[in-house]
Amino acid sequence: GLDWQRAKWGGFATKYLQFGEEVAAKCADEIIVLSKNVQQYFKDKYNRDTRFIPNGIDKMPMQDADIIKQNWGLEKDNYILFLGRIVPEKGILYLIKAFKNTKTDKKLVIAGGSSDTTEFMNEIEREAGDDDRIIFTGFIQGKTLEELYSNAYIYVLPSDLEGMPISLLEAMSYGNCCVVSSIPECTEVVQDKAVVFEQYKQILKNT
């Protein structure tokens, strides 16, 4: 995605990043983009051709639910997984609010470290409240990461802004059922191989 669109930037920082983008668009020898949507953006706004090089991943092995069962009581197909950075544009607040309105015995696992403010993390935890179905694992890697992907019932990515999400590519490589927001950076990855829901901001705009 375009960095200046991220919610964490204030007005001055946003303008500064937009200025940097314009300079790069006009002066760079080559521009590499991760998504076709951003490629079209540079063409439309700056009449600038770019080179599209998508992200790639290594195929990881399937794992039984050992570490995740010991740490959080997770078993095969008994949880819904979000995995990514804990930042506003990932749509985690929407996800928690929607999940709390469901009547399910599935757990919601929110896995990942925060690169945003402590205040935002506290807001998410307050929203989760005393719903003991919601589990925060913090940053994970290695075999624990592989176990979470291998045993998830559903992988969900409700983002408002993405580049080309590595976690979505990884989830698809494990054969997970994926549920994603309708932003182009997600839909061009999943094509017709996932459940796509209307982006929350678009829903608000249409109401």
Residue ranges of predicted features:
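Carbohydrate-associated surface elements
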Residues: 37, 56
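Nucleotide-activated donor-binding/catalytic signature segment of Leloir-type glycosyltransferases, i.e.
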Residues: 121-143
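Short alpha-helical donor nucleotide-sugar binding micro-motif in glycosyltransferases
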Residues: 139-140, 147-152
